[in-house]
Amino acid sequence: MNKISDTIIITSTSNEDEVDNNNNNNNLKEIDRSPRVNNNNNNILTNVNNNKNNTITSSGGSDSSSSSSNNNNNKIKKSKKHKEKEHMDSIVKLYSGKFDSWMVICHLFKYRDNPGIVDFLCNKMYNLEDKDIDFYITQLCILLINQPHDQKASFSSLARFILDRCASSFRFAIKAYWIFQAFEEDGEKNLFSIEGSVYLHSPSTSPKDVPMYSNDQIVPIDLDKIYNQSQYDDDDFDLSDDDGGFEIIKKNDHHYENDHHIENDPKKDINSNNNNNNNINNNNSNNDDNNNNEILPNENSDNSINDENNQYGNSNNNNNISGENDNIKIDINSQNKSDSNIETLNSTLCEETKTSPIKDDMENNNNNNNNNNNNNNNNNNNNNINNNNINNNNINNNNNINYGHINGSLSTLDGIGQPYISQPNDPIENITQILKRNRIIYKKVEEKKELATRLREFCEMSVITCSRPLITRPRTSSLPSPLISYNSGKIGGNYHKILSPSSVDSTSLISEDDKIIEKEEEDNVVEDDDDDEVNSEDFIPTATTTATTTTTTIPNHLSKTTSGVGINSNSSTPININSAGAGAGGGGEINHIGYDDISYLDKCKTPPAESKLSDHDFEFELSKSHRCDYLNDILSFIQKLAHISKILLPIPIDLRQAKLKHEISLLNINLPLGLYVPLWQSSNHHCVVRIPPEEVKILNSRERVPFLLVLEVIESEHEALSSNIFEVVSSYLQYTTGNSALKKDDIKRKYYSEKFKKSFLNSSINSTISNSSDSCTTETTTTSPVATSPTLPINIPHSKLINDGSNSISKSLPVTPTQSTVLNNLISTSTAISPPSQQQQLPSPSNTTTTTTTTTTNTNNTTTTTTTTTTTLSTSPTNEKILNENKQNSSPFGESWQEKIERYKKISPFGDYPNWRLYSVIVKTGDDCRQEQMAVQLISKFDEIWKETRLPLYLRPYSILVTSSGGGIIETIPDTMSLHNLKKSTPGFTTLLNYFKSTYGDPSGLRFRTAQSNFIESMAAYSIVTYILQIKDRHNGNILIDKEGHIVHIDFGFILSNSPGNISFESAPFKLTQELVDVMGGIQSGQFQYFKVLCVRGLIEARKQVDKIISLIEIMMSGPKMSCFVGGKEVIEQLKARFFLDVNERECSTLVENLISYSIDHFKTRYYDKYQSWLNGIYQ
């Protein structure tokens, strides 16, 4: 051979081979110290070995101990496998007895890097109760998103379990969908923040040029364009993307003034090409004339290696350093745009192992190269550059450049070589590292976002097909591929539209017996666990944006038009399933398909059991279309509520209430059938049938516009399962059996009668006057509903067409008389929803100001008209009784929740239904509700612990439904009032103790003592929770009291480590003012001693199960970024310290009593109440 190779392949089979290898390495060291000349006597030393597992690659100048290192590695691997087996055996033994959902979630997080344990635990979760799994749905989604291998996360057993739960539980599926959507929105926001950081740290960008983005201005971006922008060419810093790498150019003033790029110099190019060819052959030679070398990829060399076979070899191995007086150019071509290489690159940055995966790939590629001129292209060439070129003064060092920094820059990106050595006061180096770090972070965030999108789409398909979708495409199928017509939609707070899945392959379903471990599928998906390259096309569904409408020809008896209004039974009409028909249009109109005929409900109840048949089942395809539309209706409804909150923000405060009523009235008119909101604890399905506009209310907020809604729902006796969802929806109609036709006429007559209109207004006049800024006149109340409602003439022909069409359908279809009459009854009842709320002249967005102005100027006339109307409408005995009951209720709480339920049950068109219910919710938009959801989840765990130990401590958790990264729906607590409103609304209020005396009677009586005990038990419970979780912002607006005397805390925006204004003003462990102590009877009373005992016992029992609290918080810390985790790992350490784990129970009792003594009437607590009173007007 003509040249001495830098890479020597050594294969050892015995101790004698080791000695020979050591001698060969010593000879190689001597050769490297001598001048590099062509020496045919020094050839590559290769010992043939039949054992391929012991083959290693070593660099010139490095000692080799192949057998010993291999033996050590084998011992380490065996010890790891032994430990994993011990862990597995201990877990199997642990789970052989009793286990619960918390144990599974905790061990899933602890052993998340062990696939075997994860598979075992996921199989165990199939045996748990659904309610226990649903409680930890957020943690399960976080564990899935944060799995070690992002691209393989959708293959994992955890993903299969979640998708199986989505296929079986409609409630679980919708919640999981919104959680993954929130992760997707988080990724989009993070990508924009990284882009802003790139612009901010660029020398060519001034602060005024940094783009400001809002949540509504989110568009897809490509970070590669940032690095290809020409604006960097005119500055002291240049960063361009060349096959995924960086090019950093530092220019002197001469080149900057001439505005001439270095690469445009022809002399420079000639020298570069010549030196590049020379330096490949003589990379470590002592040539003093080589003063113009550059670090460039070996593109011009005749002996260059193919980029596809050696992607990293050219960038890392053919690096030649040039020392030039004026110009230094560094070209780092280190990464490829393929996902597999990005994953490999990111894995090197973790520095978990000393050997880089990139290094192994390059060694394998170089080992297969027999070209003698390419022997210098190995991954250890960087060491030769540092040790030979630099140390032997082969480069002109007049520039005083630290070449360790140059090599550090290479190693920072590639994960190879020496760490980065930062130079003080060097802005170029700092910017370089920031941009490199941002690029790597950008890629990782983008992968997380894509994974969240993929999982969200899988949740959609699980609901629509009632089974877990296949991750890989079917081997042989005559039907289209799964999800071929799906579209992921627009991101960034906008609604993700789901297209009708008429082309979804029926073979994409999996039977119920198929749980997790599918050997055949795993073999098809991943052939080699060590292979980091995963083809995304194998499991990412194909999304097409053009196929938005699917046309299917159906028989005559099932034909209907595109809009779902007209029904034609004479001819075969195609069904056009349009993606725009899900209600994303303006004006709050929500169109739905397939719910106007009871026959469609029958056809869509349950998919066929033979879901894997190759025949194209039309009924099953039609059911999938209806499921898609049903899911669209629910998502569109929630999105519309969030949109209402946004459009109220720019409106003046005094006009918001009228505008909110108007928007809710429009939404109420077009309310689709069977809307399901999975907010409450019950797993049974329910149907939202009406939203009374007169009960809506704007809540106090300085920056957002949250509002309160009252929902009329009909609960079902069945669970919200994906397979029987339409059976449940159709079961709501069975409550109107028996003389259905007569009942339909009675409802119509009742609706159009003057008596019903007067009754409705009479019962709701009080709430209308208090909540609305616009008044109701006599002329408005006596006007016909058809004349007052602008949208009613559209709804009436709609019902007529359906009624007429249903008669023809009943003749051609084998529908029972009960079903057909029930359908007509439902339609007439649905039409009867809107006119009562429209009897008031609702102001349009254009004339809102005019209406309010008229109301303000004519205050006296309005009052007189309202009084007259009340007197006129109070003729009915029933309505007069209701009004008298409202007047007699002089409690500061006003009308109780049960009284309101009875009142609406009498006047609601759906009040005759046996399972009719009334709920109230708060819609929040613009705030991330996930932190508050976590706080309520922790409170639920405390409540569970104390109930198990039978401690009389009272906590009132409430439900929070996260619908996006910036919004949610919150359950309200009925019959409660904040201490602020209690003091404000109670005439002559003095102290809380006097209120208890006036409300519950004599302090020695049973009612007072019961209310006092409720107050003490709730105060003790929330005092412990407030201290453990460090809940701040405890003013009287965030503390509620109910009619029974319980204290309830709400609004957990500041917990663990954050506080209002980032100022730790509330330094007391919990709020215990003198006013609260007086209700307990004073410090020396026996009731206050009872309070102390409850606090001590509560903390002692809680610290016995501290792992349930700690593990939940640790999992949440690995999820979305929340302000309560700004303290990092110290949050967990401080949380453990507050449980007093290092002391016994006696010492713990003393510490708790000290906390109570310290909190009594603390001066900072009083000052914070004064501050809130001065700033926000909250009563002290």
From Swiss-Prot:
Region (Disordered): 15-84, 257-327, 355-391, 768-799, 832-894
Residues annotated as domain PIK helical: 1-206
Composition bias type Basic residues, residue spans: 75-84
Region (Catalytic loop): 1030-1038
Keywords: ATP-binding, Kinase, Nucleotide-binding, Transferase
GO biological process terms, semicolon-separated: aggregation involved in sorocarp development; chemotaxis to cAMP; phosphatidylinositol phosphate biosynthetic process; phosphatidylinositol-mediated signaling; response to Gram-positive bacterium
InterPro entries named in the record: ARM-type_fold, Kinase-like_dom_sf, PI3/4_kinase_cat_dom, PI3/4_kinase_cat_sf, PI3/4_kinase_CS, PI3K_accessory_dom, PI3K_accessory_sf, PI4KB-PIK1_PIK
Chemical reaction(s) catalysed: a 1,2-diacyl-sn-glycero-3-phospho-(1D-myo-inositol) + ATP = a 1,2-diacyl-sn-glycero-3-phospho-(1D-myo-inositol 4-phosphate) + ADP + H(+)
Annotated region (G-loop), positions in chain: 901-907
Sequence segments annotated as region (Activation loop): 1049-1073
Pfam families: PI3_PI4_kinase (PF00454), PI4KB-PIK1_PIK (PF21245)
Entry similarity comment: Belongs to the PI3/PI4-kinase family. Type III PI4K subfamily.
PANTHER family given in the database record: PHOSPHATIDYLINOSITOL 4-KINASE BETA, PHOSPHATIDYLINOSITOL KINASE
Protein name per Swiss-Prot or TrEMBL: Phosphatidylinositol 4-kinase
Name of the gene: pikD
